[in-house]
Amino acid sequence: MDQEAGFMVNFINSYFIALGVLIGGALIGGLGAYLAGEPPLTAITKLANRLKIWALVAAIGGTFDAVYSFERGILEGNTRDIFKQLLLIISAMGGAQSGWLIISWLTQEHLSS
């Protein structure tokens, strides 16, 4: 995440980046499944389940920034950075879960299983 921007900006961006990665990736993947002759709604649901972790990684800006923040918080005693990073991860998890829920509502795939 951008260190120059304020924390709330990064917090909101983290949520919506994860949401966009999950919804966009699943819908574009569903289009690819349709073009390949596979059932698109099933493919969208499967992709949404698989993309959750990647939406989280994309939203927090890669794993090295998070690891560096944790390292700085632990080794330098800067617990504020650890708390901020945890909040950013929770925000990204919320965005990914919201995206998965929207996909679940749109496809209604859980009703046919």
Swiss-Prot record:
Coiled coil: none annotated. GO terms for biological process: sporulation resulting in formation of a cellular spore. InterPro entries: Spore_YtrH. One of its GO terms (cellular component) is membrane. It is a multi-pass membrane protein. Induction: Transcriptionally regulated by sigma-E. The keyword Transmembrane helix applies. Pfam families: Spore_YtrH. Disruption phenotype: Impaired ability to form spores when associated with a ytrI deletion. In combination with a ybaN deletion, cells show a severe sporulation defect. It is found in: Forespore outer membrane. The keyword Metal-binding does not apply. The chain crosses the membrane at residues 16-36, 51-71, 86-106. Keywords: Membrane, Sporulation, Transmembrane, Transmembrane helix. Involved in sporulation. May contribute to cortex formation or stability. This is Sporulation membrane protein YtrH. The gene is ytrH.
